[in-house]
């Protein structure tokens, strides 16, 4: 724990394989302790600011419950709860919050903002999501895969199907490279990740005994997969023309029962960071149905509700893994 004390958690690329393993192992320990009712508070009296430019269910609840479990106090600043970017610069906000709080979580748009918060606040800063990255999500994804598959991380064949430029896809590729996994990214060529990120991840994977495959061939990409992972195709606020183009590109990559069978592995599990457009039981789901005639988007309801789906175990693990990050970087 001491070697990560006062460290920021901005991107997985800042961490070694041993450091990632430590965080994942600590997550398991903290989860067991919580279930057994023997958790020890390592953050008693600490004050934490949660700075959200984007609303969230899982990230907010995970940070809040993890902090409370560990004896810390939380202030939530939502999209209209601070002056950052409006009447006050990120640099000034960082220095204000750094003088009052022991740690800061940021969930928003720009990776540059979370980096500036870390640069100027003087306290640990944790990335709860940016447009480019989502490192806390990956810890939960990997922990869940290990729990269910009962395999060491470097033996897991992890496949992401969908938008290859997505922040979760970026973060998963980084994490898989660091952990020495086999990672397949199955997506249309138009949605491949940047060459810069791919080259960096390939270099890391080579050093750690991992392998990365980028392909638009679904059969090739999913073969042998232990995990099939997807995320939403579009984000709220993107213009209609983006939705239409993205849906047309990605509709062949919807995760269906047939796609799951193509893995040839009867033990393949399905993961998703949530929320998911797998039915029409939401306002957005109904709008998608009315506008595009679709009742399911990135995954069918059949797969989402199947025994192969571990999405709610994965969601719970957000709290345990986020707790590990905070305890490791801030705990006594």
UniProtKB/Swiss-Prot annotation:
GO biological process, one term: arginine biosynthetic process via ornithine
Gene3D superfamilies on file: Aspartate/ornithine carbamoyltransferase (3.40.50.1370)
EC number: 2.1.3.3
Gene expressing this chain: arcB1
Pfam families named among the record's database cross-references: OTCace, OTCace_N
Lineage top rank: taxon: Bacteria
Organism: Staphylococcus epidermidis (strain ATCC 12228 / FDA PCI 1200)
Listed name of the protein: Ornithine carbamoyltransferase 1, catabolic
Keyword Kinase among record annotations: no
Binding-site residues for L-ornithine, renumbered to this chain: 167, 231, 235-236
């Amino acid at each position: 724990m001491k070697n990560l004390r006062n460290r920021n958690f901005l991107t997985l690329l800042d961490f070694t394989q041993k450091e990632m393993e430590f965080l994942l192992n600590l997550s398991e320990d903290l989860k067991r302790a919580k279930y057994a009712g023997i958790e020890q508070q390592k953050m008693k009296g600490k004050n934490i600011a949660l700075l959200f430019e984007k609303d969230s269910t899982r990230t907010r609840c995970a940070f809040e419950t993890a902090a409370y479990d560990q004896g810390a106090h939380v202030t939530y600043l939502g999209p209209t709860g601070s002056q950052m970017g409006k009447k006050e610069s990120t640099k000034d906000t960082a220095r204000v919050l750094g003088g009052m709080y022991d740690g800061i979580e940021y969930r928003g748009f720009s990776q540059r903002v979370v980096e500036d918060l870390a640069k100027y606040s003087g306290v640990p800063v944790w990335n709860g999501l940016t447009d480019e990255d989502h490192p806390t999500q990956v810890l939960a994804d990997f922990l869940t895969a290990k729990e269910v598959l009962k395999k060491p991380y470097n033996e897991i064949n992890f496949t992401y199907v969908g938008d290859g430029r997505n922040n979760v896809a970026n973060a998963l590729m980084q994490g898989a490279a660091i952990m020495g996994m086999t990672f397949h990214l199955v997506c249309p060529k138009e949605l491949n990740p940047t060459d810069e990120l791919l080259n960096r991840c390939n270099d890391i994977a080579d050093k750690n005994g991992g392998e990365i495959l980028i392909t638009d061939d679904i059969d090739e990409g999913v073969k042998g997969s232990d995990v099939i992972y997807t995320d939403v195709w579009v984000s709220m606020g993107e213009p209609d023309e983006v939705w239409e183009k993205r849906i047309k590109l990605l509709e062949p990559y919807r995760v269906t029962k047939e796609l799951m069978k193509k893995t040839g592995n009867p033990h393949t599990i399905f993961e998703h960071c949530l929320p998911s457009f797998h039915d029409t039981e939401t306002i957005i789901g109904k709008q998608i149905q009315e506008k595009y005639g679709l009742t399911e988007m990135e995954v069918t309801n059949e797969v989402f509700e199947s025994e192969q789906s571990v999405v709610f175990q994965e969601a719970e693990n957000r709290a345990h893994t986020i707790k590990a990050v905070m305890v490791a970087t801030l705990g006594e």
